[in-house]
């Protein structure tokens, strides 16, 4: 159960960020203790509004291609029926983009006014065609002009600048056409499909994602076109959170208009794990006030995504009234992961903080009730029993900030008041200002319902991404065993600790080359006992190899009925018949000495 490291520091050909070690020098929000929703341009997508003072819009995506008109129309209407505010349809070819004409005719003939967005990769010609028929078109800066996604050959500083000119040359006419037709554009960067020139310049980093978006956004600014939505997606919530934060700061730094954000975590998976991973990433950004429209990407029927997204928005509503913590600015860099340095302190004989991974505990009274500890690494006594120091509200934190010596060194601090994220950040700021390295315990008492489960995942996901938290205790969720497992699952969802097999799986779309929901179930059943590995399950190659960069092994659609197996980012077995692919994956894992019998 080792901690999972971040994907490394930004690499160093060039940086506009100047180190970015202090939040106050490069802020993404005005106040990290009292977030308010970011004030943005309002984008019109048909009858829908994104950003400004509009409610956060929920969207989803069909699993069909536009050429299959009947199924595409049926899925669009089904999504609209459950409250989806915008439906996205992939158009992988020019012919598919042409098919959008008939899809839109039938959707509107059915009395459905939900706006539609086309999703385009590799095909600028298809993007131009899609503008004729739908209200919004998403393009991917990783492959709109640059299509050499996985090659870094012949990349130089000169070729990088020449590439920027090519982007302007190719993208400007598209922006002009969108402006003429009254359409909206999403500049949708994916961590898994950065252009080769961006990888050359910045590495496989958050900075590369941000600069990819900024390059295309500069074209929109030059054309005085502001009907733009931005997204920076990754399958790693920690990467996604840092990327959106940095983009908000960069837009402000550059003096661009504040464009709205489409927030999501790609390849979240299915079931409870998919929901927790989505909450850890999307929820953290909702709590930062950075989301204007969201999509929860589950490897399930698209209509299942909508109620989860709606519940997540409800769970992560921002407080109406600010809290007065009266502590110094929380300067910790929000763009580069580094766990807060702490001294080791023991709770019930178990070391918390220091070099130990984030520990999972259980309330001692809960163990007494059930007689079962179930994987908990320590038993938490009363919250007011040494070495625990409980702060219940902003006044407690402010009092400590004024007189930190009143609390003995070697304590474990715990905030149990409202708004866990802002409270723990304020606590950390007070500790840092006092030169204290006492550990912090993240404690949450929740009820057994989806809203509170999503919220606690968002809270903990946000805090561990900030490098805060040395132990986690969830109290009140079903029972002691379930509370402990939920805590471990949230830490895994937030890429903090791995306690079971990690599955990275994309939602199905029109590019998917096999029944991914069925295959996902089979792979989970076959490999779910391998707690020390990560497996990517991807429908196609558009984002697959890149988005599963964290995975040890990958199962990727390589063609109709054919699968390519990956080890890391390297394709090691190609053109495998789908019916043989799972056993071939077993053999590959055995060959690498990582197989264990269930």
Predicted regions and their residues:
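N-terminal amphipathic alpha-helix/helix-capping segment at the start of soluble metabolic enzymes
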Residues: 21-60, 175, 179, 318-365, ...
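Active-site mouth loops of central-metabolism enzymes
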Residues: 53-71, 116-123, 198-210, 266-276, ...
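Hydrophobic faces of well-ordered beta-strands that scaffold small-molecule active sites
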Residues: 56-62, 87-89, 116-120, 137-139, ...
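Glycine-rich, proline-tolerant flexible connector loops at the mouths of alpha/beta enzymes
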Residues: 63, 81-107, 141-162, 228-237, ...
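Short, acidic/polar
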Residues: 67-78, 122-127, 278-282, 369, ...
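Hydrophobic or amphipathic alpha-helical targeting/insertion segments
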Residues: 113-151, 157-177, 182
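Catalytic alpha/beta core domains of metabolic enzymes, predominantly
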Residues: 155-171, 176, 198-342, 347, ...
């Amino acid at each position: 159960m080792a901690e999972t490291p971040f994907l490394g520091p930004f690499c160093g050909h060039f940086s506009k960020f100047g180190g970015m070690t202090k939040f106050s020098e490069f802020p993404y929000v005005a106040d990290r203790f009292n977030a308010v929703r970011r004030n943005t341009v309002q984008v019109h997508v048909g009858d829908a509004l994104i950003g400004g003072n509009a409610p956060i819009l929920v969207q989803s995506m069909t699993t069909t291609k536009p050429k299959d008109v009947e199924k595409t129309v049926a899925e669009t209407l089904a999504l609209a029926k459950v409250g989806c505010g915008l439906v996205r349809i992939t158009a992988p070819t020019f012919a598919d983009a042409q098919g959008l004409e008939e899809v839109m005719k039938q959707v509107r003939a059915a009395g459905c006014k939900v706006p539609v967005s086309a999703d385009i990769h590799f095909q600028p010609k298809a993007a131009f065609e899609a503008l004729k028929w739908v209200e919004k078109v998403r393009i991917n800066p990783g492959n709109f002009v640059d299509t050499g996604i996985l090659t870094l050959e012949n990349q130089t500083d000169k070729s990088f600048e020449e590439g920027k000119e090519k982007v302007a040359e190719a993208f400007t006419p598209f922006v002009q056409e969108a402006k003429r037709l009254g359409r909206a554009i999403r500049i949708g960067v994916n961590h898994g499909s950065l252009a080769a020139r961006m990888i050359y310049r910045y590495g496989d980093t958050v900075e590369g994602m941000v600069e990819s978006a900024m390059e295309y956004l500069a074209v929109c600014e030059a054309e005085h076109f502001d009907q733009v939505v931005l997204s920076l997606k990754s399958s790693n919530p920690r990467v996604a959170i840092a990327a959106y934060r940095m983009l908000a700061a960069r837009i402000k730094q550059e003096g661009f208009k504040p464009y709205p954000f489409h927030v999501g975590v790609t390849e979240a998976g299915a079931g409870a794990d998919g929901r927790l991973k989505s909450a850890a990433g999307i929820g953290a950004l909702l709590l930062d006030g950075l989301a204007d429209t969201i999509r929860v990407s589950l490897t399930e029927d698209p209509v299942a995504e909508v109620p989860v997204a709606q519940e997540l928005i409800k769970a992560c509503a921002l407080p109406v009234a600010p809290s007065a913590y009266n502590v110094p600015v929380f300067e910790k860099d929000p763009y580069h992961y580094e766990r807060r340095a702490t001294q080791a302190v023991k709770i019930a004989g178990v070391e918390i903080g220091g070099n130990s991974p984030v520990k999972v505990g259980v309330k001692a009274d809960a163990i007494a009730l059930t007689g079962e500890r179930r994987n908990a690494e320590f038993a938490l006594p009363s919250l007011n029993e040494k070495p625990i120091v409980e702060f219940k509200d902003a006044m407690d934190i402010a009092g400590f900030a004024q007189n930190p010596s009143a609390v003995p060194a070697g304590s474990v601090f715990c905030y149990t008041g409202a708004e866990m994220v802002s409270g723990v950040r304020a606590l950390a700021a007070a500790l840092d200002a006092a030169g204290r390295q006492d550990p912090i315990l993240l404690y949450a008492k929740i009820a057994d319902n989806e809203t509170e489960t999503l919220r606690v995942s968002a809270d903990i996901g946000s805090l561990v991404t900030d490098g805060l938290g040395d132990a986690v205790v969830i109290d009140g969720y079903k029972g002691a065993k379930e509370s402990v497992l939920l805590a471990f699952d949230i830490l895994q969802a937030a890429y903090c600790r791995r306690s079971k097999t990690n599955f990275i799986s994309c939602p199905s779309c029109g590019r998917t080359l096999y029944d991914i929901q069925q295959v996902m179930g089979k792979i989970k059943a076959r490999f779910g006992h391998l707690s020390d590995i990560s497996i990517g399950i991807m429908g196609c190659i558009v984002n697959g190899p890149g988005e599963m960069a964290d995975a040890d092994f990958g199962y990727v659609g390589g063609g109709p009925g054919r699968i390519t197996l990956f080890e890391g980012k390297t394709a090691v077995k190609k053109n495998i018949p789908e019916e043989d692919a799972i056993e071939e994956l077993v053999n590959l894992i055995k060959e690498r000495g990582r197989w264990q019998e269930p």
